[in-house]
Amino acid sequence: MEKLREFHEFKIKGNFIFDLYHTLEYYESLWKRKKSKYEDYDVIKKRVYKLKPVLDTIDRKKFVLAHIDAVPDNFLMTDTGKVYLIDWEYAGMQDIYVDLAMFAIYTGYTKEETDRLIRLYFDGDCSDEIYWRIMAYEAVGGLLWSNWCEFKEDLGIYFDKYPETQYGYAKKYS
């Protein structure tokens, strides 16, 4: 988390905004079937969209380059202990706390593990507002990546329990 925090502190700016809701809809539009495999998908999607008005109040001028795909496999450590962050295909301008949420959901963290991750990132000092935003991003990210998985499944690519885990975050935190 120290390396991710250091990266965020550079406050790099760019032109592309990674829009979570747009990307969620994009992957849904790629499905060959017209309905999700999850029976309660429409209900969960509505709950996730209820978070949007609050998340939309975040000042986009404060967005900086976020990795978006901060999965543990994308943190490479050399023999000398130097850490590199690789695989930038999803990177874009976004609230930095999206990276914390994505790290937690990619790794299948429980709420307790996510809380520990947040404490590490903030050295124990995270405001309630930021904590809530991270949880909201877990919900949106969970639905986004479960939609991505459904698209991939249409192509014959399967991910074991990963889609259900992602969908579970959308259900739990929305």
Task: Show where each model-derived region lies.
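Active-site activation/catalytic loop segments of kinase-like enzymes and analogous catalytic loops
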Residues: 97-126, 139-157, 169
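Conserved catalytic-loop position in the HRD/HxD motif
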Residues: 69, 87
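Regulatory N- and C-terminal appendages and interdomain linkers associated
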Residues: 170-174
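A glycine-centered beta->alpha junction motif in the catalytic cores
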Residues: 9-12, 26-36, 143-158
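An alpha-helical support segment within catalytic cores of ATP-dependent transferases
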Residues: 12-68, 80
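Protein kinase-like catalytic domain
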Residues: 8-12, 59, 104, 125
